[in-house]
């Protein structure tokens, strides 16, 4: 082997690394083809960078893809003599690799000469490969400022001239429904503590692949090209779906610059790499991460520097619907908490985006064991660690994909896949207890499987539904008692303002009048009407009008009689009025003929001795004369007696009894 030689030149042909072997670090002589990677800006920035001659431990290896295409990868070590090296390679297991590395600066700790011409803020990790069949997601991993990590890239261009750019991804890429691509072989058989880092092609134009555009995006807080991702002050990360069958995870990582120590990635998570171990964390169950596995240093990093805020991106092939919570804040500091809500990425690039509410970041101080409903992707994950804090306390940004913004204090919604009916949800098992919200106890209750935090932290979780009629009787969230009373008062006022006047009923009158004297209003109203009728009747009698008993106690006096003009009071008419009425009515005969009267009328002789002494004989009401013994009397069917001559004439005119007004003779 030759001596140590590390060179970085402005060449478009060959970029080579030659390494000498050492006792604890076997290396290989490899040559990577550097084609069309360094532009004018990158070439200009690399002029002021000098490589330390003692940096001889940069292992460089290659892997073979399915179609035999060359793939290069490299590793980065630490400053200590025995440290864990950052391993970018392919393997089906998590391997920890302990190496005894010689002295000298490493690729993650290189110092800049003079005025630090090379900016290490946002240097993309780009590995181009001709394997177009490898499906994955692109990622722009931008390092923090002050030069903590320098990521270089190498590419290989195939014969067809179409090189799909591969980017280093901190977690493995899982492909469902397709064959798993061959992993990259590791140079050393020892284990790597940080796991395998897969390479994914970039085939979507949502995020540029050049490092210059990556630096521009990382320096700005706002999203320039509308890419579904987030941009923080210290780092920028963007991911977009390439295939529907990608299971994608990203761990939260942060870097706090310190003049004495250089940690490669103090907050990297050690996450299982197999699909069976990843699936229980998303979709069907709720899993939490302990603070010890999250922060190896065990310290509180809230005071130093900006920190990357990653969210795990999850995409399963049409088995788990799109769901998630997007962070609305750009700079969020976390010490031992990891907001791992996956965003609602699309299954394919051509599908329209689904409108899902987006709320601010989550700060939970208590871990609550949530009940799991089979077949429903769980939106609520456990959050551990009491040190979670937000650098923008009091700033609530609730957003919806599609540029709709909510200014409400808490956004409450539910969302389930279309395959899950509303009846399959048991809201009693999904509403958390108040102990899982926050210490202050002012949290709101949200129906569904999502707990909400308090108003002081201005945080909320989202589980969006498919419309307002969805579970109308179960989706009414309970607010604080004061807010609930205010809502009810406003609602009742609005209903009273738009309500039409209704007719009075006895029930309403009774309800309104109760409680004064203990007597229902309906009873008092009846008694009042009786008194009014009696008073009116007395007034009519005082005026000399004809008043009947029935008119007082059976229906009341007709004070306002609409048919008064149509009625005729023949008792108070004069003779002339009766003649005029007779002429107007005409000759109306309702009596019987002479033959019928003679045939049907019962006759007898009057005899005074047949009468009892106590009974006084009344005279004939028709002729008003006394009966004399031997007079002929006629008896009607009702039992009244009259003179035969008088009653004959009466029956010919009218077939009624002059006394009782009943039918005189029934033919």
From Swiss-Prot:
GO terms for molecular function: ubiquitin protein ligase activity; zinc ion binding. Induction: By pantothenate. Pfam families: zf-RING_2 (PF13639). Residues 288-309 have a biased composition (Low complexity). A zinc finger (RING-type) spans 620-661. The keyword ATP-binding does not apply. Keywords: Growth regulation, Metal-binding, Transferase, Ubl conjugation pathway, Zinc, Zinc-finger. Pathway: Protein modification; protein ubiquitination. Signal peptide: none annotated. GO terms for biological process: protein ubiquitination. It is an enzyme of class 2 (transferase). Gene3D superfamilies: Zinc/RING finger domain, C3HC4 (zinc finger). Residues 142-163, 285-311 are annotated as: Disordered. Its EC number is 2.3.2.27. It catalyses: S-ubiquitinyl-[E2 ubiquitin-conjugating enzyme]-L-cysteine + [acceptor protein]-L-lysine = [E2 ubiquitin-conjugating enzyme]-L-cysteine + N(6)-ubiquitinyl-[acceptor protein]-L-lysine. It comes from the Eukaryota. Belongs to the RING-type zinc finger family. Interacts with HAL3. PANTHER family: E3 UBIQUITIN-PROTEIN LIGASE MBR1-RELATED (PTHR22937:SF224), E3 UBIQUITIN-PROTEIN LIGASE RNF165 (PTHR22937). The RING-type zinc finger domain mediates binding to an E2 ubiquitin-conjugating enzyme. Probable E3 ubiquitin-protein ligase that functions downstream of HAL3 and is required for HAL3-regulated plant growth. Activation of HIP1 by HAL3 may lead to the degradation of cell cycle suppressors, resulting in enhancement of cell division and plant growth. This is Probable E3 ubiquitin-protein ligase HIP1. It comes from Oryza sativa subsp. japonica (Rice).
